[in-house]
A protein has these predicted regions:
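Structured alpha-helical
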Residues: 1-109
């Protein structure tokens, strides 16, 4: 069954920094590629997995978006990490616009 999203999702190609906790007192920060984004979440590609449910911070263009990992799927060049943004840090075009952004609602096949 296909899910219908309530908001537009945008494909993009943007370098981002991703931070998450890897223990009770240590966090890890890695470079990532922001693959897609919408008001409530996005997908980043990393070289290593992040456990589902982990608190995560995605930063690009000087803006930070907090959230939780919803999925982590192995791909050919790393892992695709789905992030649901926290209600107090939603994304909008007014905050940060990724490079090469394509609105999937306007793509026809």
């Amino acid at each position: 069954m296909h899910q219908r999203r309530m908001e537009s999702r945008f494909l993009c190609a943007e370098l981002a920094r991703v931070s998450w906790m890897v223990g009770p007192d240590r966090h890890q920060t890695e470079e990532a590629i922001l693959e897609d984004i919408c008001a409530t979440g996005g997908c980043v590609q990393l070289e290593e997995p992040i456990p589902v449910g982990s608190v995560i911070m995605v930063t690009f263009r000087g803006q930070r978006f907090d959230g939780r990992v919803r999925y982590c799927v192995s791909g050919e060049f790393g892992y695709f990490i789905g992030v649901k943004f926290a209600a107090d840090t939603p994304w909008s075009r007014d905050l940060a616009v990724p490079d090469h952004m394509i609105n999937l609602d306007t793509v026809t096949m």
